């Protein structure tokens, strides 16, 4: 699959498609768009040693938890897929789980990325095949991105979303996020630092902060921020992202208290002890889903954080990235 094979992208004159949204939105349904890559997952079955096919990916996991736990929220996903059977299976899986797929575009002669999970002494390791996957071209056409964002109340993306894109697609996404924010959409961002996806540390940190500059809500993980931005403590992380322009920052910190910044000030929320840890794969993604929905509903930030922590606690006591659980 090479970009030269794709002839889908004609670029009509760009206009701001977002500006009329607030004047016509009489619906009680809230709309959240998650942007990124969903991949095919092959995970081992401990009972027979065979591999099971599933679908997951950081921003998709969040979209899935929103769709499965909140009937009053339309959880849409924006990405690109191929025209093969595996892509079709993934789209069906999304639709079957109430994720709105109307904005996902198909690229001929392409396929989706995939990853393989292997287990050794209870530890999970991941092998990825995602270079030139269809999702890496999600920012090629600005009109596709604008249309996807037009009817949303909130747009959510991550550092992994940014990492898989080339510089042109990244600039397109940034431009569309800026227009959406100017039109009153809330922009939410999980930095989700994954150095293996980047050319080098400097590129990763520079692009992450560029994404933060466009965001209202930022949901970092302290362990990553301490490693790559050398933050001494969660308050340092809060202040750095506050200075980038966010009005809400929530710092996840494994099982330790969660720190937050909002217009009401800085605070912490203690976390209940976790029972038996089975699989922490989507702890942060599930947590994010409850915080984002809570902020859209305008409940208190501490209540939203508590809801997120309770869901994440259930998720890590289940198996896999997507765990059915009523919140």
Question: Where do the model's predicted regions map?
Answer:
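Active-site metal-binding loops of divalent metal-dependent hydrolases
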Residues: 38, 160, 191, 286
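Glycine/threonine-rich flexible loop motifs
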Residues: 162-170, 198-199, 229-230
